[in-house]
């Protein structure tokens, strides 16, 4: 077993997990990433490949796809082992203190420490299952790989959170017309995003819900929407419909792993330690007072978790890694 034991195993290969792997390399830790999805990148890869991300210092704007590509390239600097399509379902601490991680397919992994960076958990988008949505499989979208397919099209976006507003704004300069349908009034999104939306060409329909999809031969041509305050209806011509109604989050068996959890994640202290010695958490997996849930904050928490894991293994180790500009791997 010794040659199979890693210093740290990072569960979750999203942006925070990838950057944590890079930082663990700076700390000379033998590192493994295990991700439940077929490829690393997390929700950013799945939901935001062509969306513009603006909440990372020093990067005014970057697509999700490019951000993930950069983070993956950076993570591979120190050659971590990356395992995809495996969902960790059980963690057991052995008599020698090593953790045994069991995946859903029966694979076994061994690690001296664990960093949980699974975000909110594994996820599945909430799909539109009524209104005969199955009749329009190519016109109803939950994520987009190629935004150019909507150039000069009329597009409807349904939802009122950050994702819906981001998509409406991303599509606005590409599409002929963008409509945003929201059943509420106060958008659940960043204030500046809402302000930009209100100053854009996007036609906003608050207090409205979709009540009928109309088209032929699997081609959506229009939707009917109803005002939930007045019951008045109207018809909107459209070529495509985006559904942004949130996701179903599955924390799987984590609740059985022994650490304290709260409503918004795994409880950690200021060193990203969970209540189980040797297990740490960061990013959207973790919660603590005054938590800020943006990518930039998670990129800060990941190195804290790795430093804590390093100190757990070697109490006399330095508190933090030498800055990368002075690291031997980047000199010469």
From Swiss-Prot:
Bridged cysteine pairs (disulfide)? none
Q: One GO MF term, please?
A: NADP binding
UniProt remark on cofactor binding: Binds 1 FAD per subunit.
**Is Transcription regulation tagged as a keyword?**
no
Q: Which reaction does it catalyse?
A: 2 reduced [2Fe-2S]-[ferredoxin] + NADP(+) + H(+) = 2 oxidized [2Fe-2S]-[ferredoxin] + NADPH
Q: Where does FAD bind?
A: 35, 43, 48, 88, 123, 284, 325
What EC number(s) would the UniProt record show?
1.18.1.2
Q: Partners and quaternary state? A: Homodimer.
Q: What is this protein called?
A: Ferredoxin--NADP reductase 1
| The organism of origin for this protein | Listeria monocytogenes serotype 4b (strain F2365)
């Amino acid at each position: 077993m010794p040659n199979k034991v890693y210093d740290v195993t990072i569960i979750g290969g999203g942006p925070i997990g990838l950057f944590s792997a890079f930082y663990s390399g700076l700390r000379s830790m033998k590192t493994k990433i295990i991700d439940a999805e077929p490829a690393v990148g997390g929700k950013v890869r799945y939901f935001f490949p062509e969306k513009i991300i603006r909440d990372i210092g020093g990067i005014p704007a970057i697509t999700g796809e490019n951000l993930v590509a950069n983070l993956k390239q950076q993570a591979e600097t120190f050659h971590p082992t990356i395992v995809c399509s495996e969902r960790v379902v059980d963690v057991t601490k052995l008599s020698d203190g090593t953790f045994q991680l069991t995946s859903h397919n029966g694979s076994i992994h061994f690690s001296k420490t664990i960093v949980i960076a699974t975000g909110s958990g594994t996820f599945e988008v909430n799909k539109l299952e009524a209104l005969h949505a199955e009749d329009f499989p190519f016109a109803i979208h939950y994520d987009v790989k190629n935004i150019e397919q909507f150039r000069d099209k009329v597009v409807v976006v349904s939802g009122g959170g950050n994702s819906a507003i981001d998509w409406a704004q991303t599509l606005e300069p590409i599409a002929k017309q963008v409509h945003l349908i929201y059943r509420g009034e106060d958008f659940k999104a960043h204030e500046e995003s809402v302000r930009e939306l209100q100053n854009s060409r996007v036609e906003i329909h608050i207090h409205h819900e979709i009540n009928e999809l109309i088209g032929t031969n699997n081609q959506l041509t229009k939707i009917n929407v109803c005002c939930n305050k007045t019951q008045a209806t109207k018809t909107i011509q459209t070529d495509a419909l985006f559904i942004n109604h949130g996701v179903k989050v599955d924390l799987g068996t984590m609740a059985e792993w022994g650490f304290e959890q709260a409503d918004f994640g795994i409880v950690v202290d200021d060193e990203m330690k969970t209540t189980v010695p040797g297990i740490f958490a960061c990013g959207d997996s973790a919660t603590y007072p005054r938590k800020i849930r943006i990518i930039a904050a998670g990129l800060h928490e990941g190195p804290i978790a790795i430093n804590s894991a390093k100190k757990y293994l070697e109490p006399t180790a330095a508190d933090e890694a030498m800055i990368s500009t002075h690291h031997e791997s980047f000199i010469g």
